[in-house]
């Protein structure tokens, strides 16, 4: 039996639309991510468990974990009969890389079960392909950090899909999921087809400056440059209370904030534990909309997806 855990991730990080993402893990030790178990069997089966299992498609072939198994078998050129279990702990359409968690855990578990026949680069390429089936286009800003850990910059040149960017140990990521769903496809459809030249220049300056600040170890500058001119101005209308929440967390002391992925989760970066706690308390009282919502104080998950049992 192989059991793999894949952590939540926050894509875009305001400054890097479709090219930046960070894996996150709660400071209290909770597992914020999906778990997939693979066992040898006579025929294929898939069992869904976990807090959000009831939100998964009722037709097994529509389940992304089934599609991962099917695509992995196709890659190897043979059928591999296994019993798979998906522990769906991540809300769907949350902006926390929910589908990436399932895809990464499923493909990594299959690869481990088969003796690591695929290398990490090929496996990551498959992860991007499968994630693209849900979001509508291939992009790696959730699957890469989820699989490899840390903060990842998408490269997609010279056979390199992504590379790690150094993060800051003092940064605490407060993630508030309000309990409503925003589909990635819907959040993409709302974006303009073309952008003004000054917005393109600002975006390039912010992203280049952010990467420079990370490598030159300037956390204050890095946080200051986490601005979004590409997606947030258009997507915030999909998120009730988002603008007020951003203003409130800034007043409390967050050094940066924005939409996690395509939303509705809000992320707020803090550089002090007491500030993070006050931000989390405010968001818990004011940004959550129902019982399915939650707030976690997180750090970067530098390990990425990992085998829990083998």
Swiss-Prot record:
Entry keywords, A to Z: Amino-acid biosynthesis, ATP-binding, Cytoplasm, Kinase, Nucleotide-binding, Threonine biosynthesis, Transferase
Catalytic class of the enzyme: transferase
Amino-acid biosynthesis is among the record's keywords: yes
Subcellular localization(s) per the UniProt record: Cytoplasm
Any one Gene Ontology molecular-function term assigned to this protein's record: homoserine kinase activity
Pathway connected to this protein: Amino-acid biosynthesis; L-threonine biosynthesis; L-threonine from L-aspartate: step 4/5
Keyword Nucleotidyltransferase assigned: no
GO biological process, one term: threonine biosynthetic process
GO CC annotations, alphabetized: cytoplasm
Residues given in the record as ATP binding sites: 91-101
PROSITE patterns recorded: GHMP_KINASES_ATP
Pfam assignment, any one: GHMP_kinases_C
E.C. number(s) listed in UniProt: 2.7.1.39
Domain of life: Bacteria
Catalysed reactions, semicolon-separated: L-homoserine + ATP = O-phospho-L-homoserine + ADP + H(+)
Family designation: Belongs to the GHMP kinase family. Homoserine kinase subfamily.
Function: Catalyzes the ATP-dependent phosphorylation of L-homoserine to L-homoserine phosphate.
HAMAP family hit by this protein: Homoser_kinase
Protein name, per record: Homoserine kinase
Source organism (scientific name): Escherichia coli O81 (strain ED1a)
Organism phylogeny: Bacteria, Pseudomonadati, Pseudomonadota, Gammaproteobacteria, Enterobacterales
Gene: thrB
């Amino acid at each position: 039996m192989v059991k793999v855990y894949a952590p939540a991730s926050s894509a875009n990080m305001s400054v890097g639309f479709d090219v930046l993402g960070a894996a996150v893990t709660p400071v209290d030790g909770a597992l914020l991510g999906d778990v997939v178990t693979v066992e040898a069997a006579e025929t294929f089966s898939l069992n869904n468990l976990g807090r959000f299992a009831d939100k998964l498609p009722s037709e097994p072939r529509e389940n992304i974990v089934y599609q991962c198994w099917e695509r992995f078998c196709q890659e190897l050129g043979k059928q591999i009969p296994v019993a798979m279990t998906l522990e769906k702990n991540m809300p769907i359409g949350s902006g926390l890389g929910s589908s990436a968690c399932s895809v990464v855990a499923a493909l990594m578990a299959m690869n481990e079960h088969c003796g690591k026949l695929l290398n990490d680069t090929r496996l990551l390429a498959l992860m991007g392909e499968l994630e693209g089936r849900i979001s509508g286009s291939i992009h790696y800003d959730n699957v890469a950090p989820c699989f490899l850990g840390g903060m990842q910059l998408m490269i997609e040149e010279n056979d390199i899909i992504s590379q790690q960017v150094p993060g800051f140990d003092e940064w605490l990521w407060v993630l508030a999921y309000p309990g409503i769903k925003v589909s990635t496809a819907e959040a993409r459809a709302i974006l303009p087809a073309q952008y003004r030249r000054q917005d393109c220049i600002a975006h390039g300056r912010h992203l280049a400056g952010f990467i420079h600040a990370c490598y030159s170890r300037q956390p204050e500058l890095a946080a200051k440059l986490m601005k979004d001119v590409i997606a947030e101005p258009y997507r915030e209308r999909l998120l009730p209370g988002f603008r007020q929440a951003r203003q409130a967390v800034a007043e409390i002391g967050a050094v940066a904030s924005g939409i996690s992925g395509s939303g509705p989760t809000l992320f707020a970066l803090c550089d002090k534990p007491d500030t993070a706690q006050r931000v989390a308390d405010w968001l818990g009282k004011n940004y959550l909309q129902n019982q399915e919502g939650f707030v976690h104080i997180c750090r970067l998950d530098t390990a990425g997806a990992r085998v829990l049992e083998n």
